[in-house]
Each structure stands twice: as C-alpha cells, then as structure tokens.
Amino acid sequence: MHLNFGFSAVQILWTLTFAALLVLLVVLLGRDRVRRFPWFTASMALMALRMVASRLLFGKMAPIVSNEIFLALAVVAALVALLVVVEMARRAFSSASRTAWITATLVLVAVGGVVLAAWGPWPSAKTLFAGSTLGVLRLMQLIAQKAETLADLLVIQLGILVVLFGRRFHAGWRSHVQQIVIGLSTAAMAQLAVRGIWQVIALHTTIHSRADYVRVMALEEKLFNADSVVFLAALVWWIVCLWIDEPGSKAAGAPAETAPAVAEQLLPDADEEESQAEPLPSDAK
C-alpha cells in the first residue's frame, strides 16, 4: 500500500523549518535569551522573513523587482551572520586577554580569507561594475554569497576554538554559547559541503540529453534537502538547549535561594516570642 500525502519533500521541509524557527523565536523571547544573544535572535527572525517572502512573492512580481528584494535581504542576512560570529566570540571568550583576542582574530580572518579567495569562481570586474541594473544585482549577489561563505568559515573555526578552549573561559559544554556555536558550525559545515559537492558536479558534468538534465536536477534537490535536514536538526537542538537554563544561573538556582527565605518566614522571630510571652509573677515581699 502506497501512501500519497500530496506534498513534496521540499514543502514538508519548508513547513517544518518555518515552524521550528517560530518555536525558537518564542523560546528566545519567552526564556529571556534575547538580552544575551540579540544578533542571533535577529538572524533567526530574518531567516523566517526570507522564507515567508520567498513563498509569497516568488513568481508574483516582476523579475527585476523580486531579485532586488531577495538580494537585499540576502545581503542583510549575510552581514547579520558576521555579527553573530562576533557576538558568539565575545560571549565565549569575554575574559581572554587583548593579545589573545587580536591574535585569534587575525588567524581566523586570515584562514577564512584564504579559503574564500580560493572558493568558487570570481566574476570579472567589467561584469560587476557595469553601469546597469543587472550589474548592481550581480554585485549584490556576489556580496551576499561571499559574506555568507566567510561567515560559515569563521563560525566553523570559532566552533573548534569554543569546543577546545571554551571551558577555560566559562563557556563549557552546558553553556548556551557553546550550544549555539555547535549548531551554527554544524549547519555551516553542511552548507559548505553541499555547495562544494554541487560546484564539482556542475563543473564536471556534461548534459547530453533531457534525461541527464533531469537526473542532475534531482541530485541537486537531494543535496539541498539534506542541507535543510541538518539545519532543521540544528533548530531543534537550539530549542531544547535554550529552553533549559544554564547551570548556576539565577533561574536554575532559584529554589535553593528561596528555601532559606521560606524557612525564615516559617520560624517565629525571637523578638516576637519575647513580646508574646506571659510575664512572670513578681516575688512577694
């Protein structure tokens, strides 16, 4: 017996991802995590906005206008992703010395810059700086792609540093910072792996017939669906981890702190006992 749900894998993953994003935003707001991670919250809200915009506006507007909207959102999302990396680094290594900060920043940016320079083809300057709307759109697309790739490279390196040295700077396994960085780095590794595999396939595959084209497009869909599954797992990981308070936080230590106060309320005060006690009869003269 074959069950036909009438929904494709892309539609199911889109629905589950969007629902998980909404739940994560509720957890961030309800559990008061926004104060510690404002840029991470903004990135999740922006991702939900992009998903809604792609579902509602794609194919219903002029191509130039829709491309301008989607590319503008992509550029903003890429810049926010870079700010998320900075935010997580500051939270994880806030007690590190200035020298360590400068050294680690230079090393991470240098490694990320070298990999970014070698990653993928770069368009020519004439194509980017042509005085036309199409040239502007290509420049926006390049900025969004390269900034997002740089953010992925930086967050992967940051994840390695947090896992190795986070405990020394009070960012251990059960801290929200390390849990968020683990999810970000896992999603970034999956995204870069899918991009790399698809780039190799696109460069070394020759289409001879329509069947070959359909087969390659089906492979592309499977790759991006796998990336979506990894990101969905990261969303579930964040929901569970951010719902639970960190060890030693005020919310986690509330019962232990309120116990002495309750005991003081239950035990009578010594002054009240003396005032309520009956006076002893005086000695007869």
Regions found by a protein language model. Give the residues of each.
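Membrane-interfacial loop-to-transmembrane alpha-helix junctions, especially the N-terminal start
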Residues: 32-43, 100-104, 174-184
